[in-house]
Swiss-Prot record:
The species this protein was found in: Solanum lycopersicum
Residues annotated to bind an anthocyanidin: H19, A369
Gene this chain is encoded by: UGT76E1
Entry EC no(s): 2.4.1.263
pH dependence remark: Optimum pH is 3.87-7.
Protein name (Swiss-Prot/TrEMBL): UDP-glycosyltransferase 76E1
Length: 475
């Protein structure tokens, strides 16, 4: 239902692309429900205001000018959280002093955990947005609660299953690993990121019909209302591009010239860096597969090289018109194109949902954090992709051909199509994601404008009759 009186919601996104995109999509959803949306963002990776004329934007001084932010570091993330406290607090105070729309709440990305301190000081209700899968957060919390069970581990254990975390193995521990353990500063950061402080609820870019059992376990842990309203890129209507990088739309014209269900789309996201050896092995794996491909090689994504100069001699001549290389692509449009039959992906959560929603099966090449968990679920639980265990050209070639040409690949394509239909069903009127969105709107509308004293709201939006006891897709 739409609210009758105008209320404002302040969104505080984390600036990296994989976090910024779902927050802006959430903003579009909330705006469509009658809320005024204010985006308080860092100076780094400033969104394109012209793409979102329905929002009010406020730039916060993040104090990181001149610092290389192309790949995240703990120091930079902590500095960003500290530097943005005063700018956000001052802005919110000025908002509350002005007459006009009522400030309903602050919604913040879990990596911007400083917001909880600011909201608590001002006695404003806050809500956390989780931009990753429930399976990832569950694995993270399980390890954080008893790290001695999992860390450190021996090389001989890499392929052994993680206790209580099927289908993960020790090599899939979703933290940066150094000498077969996780440094304490990284564990401390993950504790801060997974905590919700005094926040009164959590919004999820996932679906009950995909992760019901994980969501129930996590809700028992956090004891606040959960609102799984994903996939937000589909729930948001007519969203303009949220990309920070310039998209090369000419690749769509190239796809138009390809046969239906023939092209492998290759993209490793907005942050991943690979070494030159991996690029060479990937290039020859693509070339030797004899399959048409669209390959995104982002500037700066190959250590020590810039885009095409890193490609092996003779590669472009060998593949000719069968391959197209771009610096960045309009991914949702690419995955929806009838020529695309597979996705060679890093398994970031946005890419995962976008691929499933377009019935595109995956070659899974994860690198870190949630990507490792997503890849295992995609390949072992949902069985809609094949995981690359070895980055070697013959293995890459065989995996691509298995996905694109084999009977096993046909089975994977059928499963991802079935998975899409269940997700689409959940977005219909009176179904799970749509109901959860209505509940979220009612919840925000009913929040007091000031909390005194600031305490979390306990209870369950997802009651036993609201969420299936066992999700079909998980079974």
């Amino acid at each position: 239902m739409k609210i009758e009186r105008k209320q404002s919601v302040v969104l505080v996104p984390h600036p990296y692309q994989g976090h910024l995109t779902p927050m802006l999509q959430l903003g579009s959803i909330l705006h469509s429900q009658g809320f005024s949306v204010i985006v308080a963002h860092t100076q780094y990776n400033t969104p394109n205001y012209s793409n979102h004329p329905q929002f009010v934007f406020h730039s916060m001084d993040d104090g990181l000018q001149g610092i290389d932010m192309s790949f995240p570091s703990l120091e930079n993330i902590y500095d960003m959280n500290e530097n943005c406290k005063a700018p956000l607090r001052n802005y919110l105070v000025s908002m509350m002093e002005e007459e006009g729309d009522q400030l309903a709440c602050i919604v913040y990305d879990n990596v911007m955990f400083f917001v909880d301190d600011v909201a608590t000081q001002l006695k404003l209700p806050s809500i956390v947005l989780r931009t990753f899968s429930a399976a990832y957060l569950h694995s993270m919390i399980t390890i954080l609660q008893q790290p001695e069970i999992y860390l450190p581990f021996e090389d001989s254990q890499l392929l052994d299953p993680l206790p209580e975390l099927h289908p993960l193995r020790f090599k899939d521990v979703p933290f940066p690993i150094i000498n077969n353990t996780v440094p304490e500063p990284i564990l401390d950061f993950c504790r801060a990121m997974s905590d919700i402080g005094s926040s009164v609820a959590t919004i999820w870019n996932t679906m009950q019909d995909l992760e019901s059992s994980m969501l129930l376990r996590l809700q028992e842990h956090y004891k606040v209302p959960f609102f799984p309203i994903g996939p937000v890129h589909k729930m948001a209507s007519l969203v303009s591009s949220t990309s920070i990088l310039e998209e090369d739309n000419s690749c769509i014209e190239w796809l138009d010239r390809q046969a239906p269900n023939s092209v492998l789309y290759v993209s490793l996201g907005s942050l991943v860096r690979i070494d030159h050896k991996e690029l060479i092995e990937t290039a020859w794996g693509l070339a030797n597969s004899d399959q048409p491909f669209l390959w995104v090689i982002r500037p700066g994504s190959v250590s020590g090289f810039q885009c095409a100069e890193a490609l092996p001699d003779g590669f472009e001549k060998m593949v000719g018109e069968r391959g197209r290389i771009v610096k960045w692509a309009p991914q949702k449009q690419v995955l929806a194109h009838p020529a695309v039959a597979g996705f060679f992906t890093h398994c970031g959560w946005n890419s995962t949902l976008e691929s499933i929603c377009e019935e595109v099966p995956m070659v899974c090449r994860p690198f870190l954090a949630d990507q490792l968990v997503n890849a295992r679920y995609l390949s072992q639980i949902y069985k809609v992709g094949f995981e690359l265990e070895v980055i070697e050209r013959t293995v890459i070639e065989k995996t691509i051909r298995k996905l694109m040409l084999s009977e096993e690949g046909k089975d994977v394509k059928k499963r991802v199509a079935d998975m899409k239909q269940k997700i689409v069903a959940g977005m219909q009127i009176d179904c799970t994601s749509h109901k959860n969105l209505n509940d979220l709107v009612d919840f925000i509308s009913a929040l007091p404008s000031r909390l005194a004293p600031p305490t979390p709201v306990f209870g369950a939006i997802m009651s036993s009759n609201h969420i299936a006891s066992k999700c079909i897709i998980e079974s």
